């Protein structure tokens, strides 16, 4: 059953927003850990976080598919609690999270590294707990980096294709995002529909990236 372009667009945007909302807190924690802490497993954590950036997206999707299969521990656990992920909207969100996480972490890590540690040290000296220092000093100073990271991560999520089509498939109205719809139309020779999807995808991506660049330029001003 076919769905309209606007329904597919709304679904893609919703999935992108959900994935960004879930990935952003995780990315903030990882970015802060990598920017501010020294620990033996740091190279391993960096490698695992960055893997989706260099692996073929289809390979990442296949890895997720294997992890979520009933023969894997994660898959067995999900099956035991009756939670179905593969070939559902949840798989779309999961693929978007995994593929956008490296970009989020890289952007946020740069933002945290640029913060003058002395502000945090002063707050700690005045009796603020580490959590309070994070909330009242670190996070406000990194707020623009957080917004930029969220926008770039959202744009990356909107354009995700390889991992999504492997782990979620292409079910119109259920798992079909703009990028998957574009591939489907191209594959079936429906050039007019493919062009419509392409222009909408370009507009959404350009808007998110342009907004992020404008915020970066504002942050760079003295």
Question: What does each of the following model-derived ranges do?
Answer:
Residues 3, 61-97, 168-171:
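Membrane-interfacial helix termini and adjacent extracytoplasmic/periplasmic loops
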Residues 5, 108, 129-150, 154:
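Short hydrophobic alpha-helical segments within the ABC transporter permease transmembrane module
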Residues 69, 146-184:
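Non-cytoplasmic
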Residues 5-34, 97:
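Transmembrane alpha-helix signature in integral membrane proteins
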Residues 41, 106-128, 132, 137, ...:
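C-terminal transmembrane helix and the adjacent membrane-cytosol boundary/short C-terminal tail
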Residues 25-30, 98-120, 147, 151, ...:
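Membrane-embedded alpha-helices of multi-pass transport/permease systems
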Residues 30-64, 120:
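Cytoplasmic-entry segments and transmembrane alpha-helices of multi-pass inner-membrane transporters
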Residues 1-7, 167-206:
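Interhelical loop and adjacent transmembrane-helix boundary motif
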């Amino acid at each position: 059953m076919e769905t309209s372009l606007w329904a597919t667009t709304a679904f893609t945007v919703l999935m992108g927003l959900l994935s960004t909302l879930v990935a952003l807190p995780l990315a903030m924690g990882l970015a802060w850990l990598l920017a501010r802490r020294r620990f033996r497993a740091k190279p391993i954590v960096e490698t695992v976080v960055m893997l989706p950036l260099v692996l073929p997206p289809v390979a990442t999707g296949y890895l997720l598919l294997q992890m979520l299969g009933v023969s894997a521990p994660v898959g067995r656990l999900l099956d035991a609690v009756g939670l179905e992920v593969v070939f559902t909207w949840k798989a779309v969100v999961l693929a978007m999270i995994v593929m956008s996480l490296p970009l989020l972490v890289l952007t946020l890590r740069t933002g945290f590294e640029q913060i003058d540690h002395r502000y945090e040290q002063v707050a700690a000296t005045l009796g603020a707990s580490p959590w309070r220092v994070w909330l009242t000093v670190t996070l406000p100073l990194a707020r623009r980096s957080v917004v930029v990271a969220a926008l770039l991560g959202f744009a990356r999520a909107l354009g995700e294709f390889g991992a999504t089509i492997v782990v979620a498939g292409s079910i119109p109205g259920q798992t079909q995002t703009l990028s998957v719809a574009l591939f489907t139309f191209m594959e079936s020779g429906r050039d007019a529909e493919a062009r419509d999807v392409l222009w909408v995808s370009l507009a959404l991506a350009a808007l998110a990236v342009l907004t992020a660049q404008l915020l970066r330029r504002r942050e760079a001003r003295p």
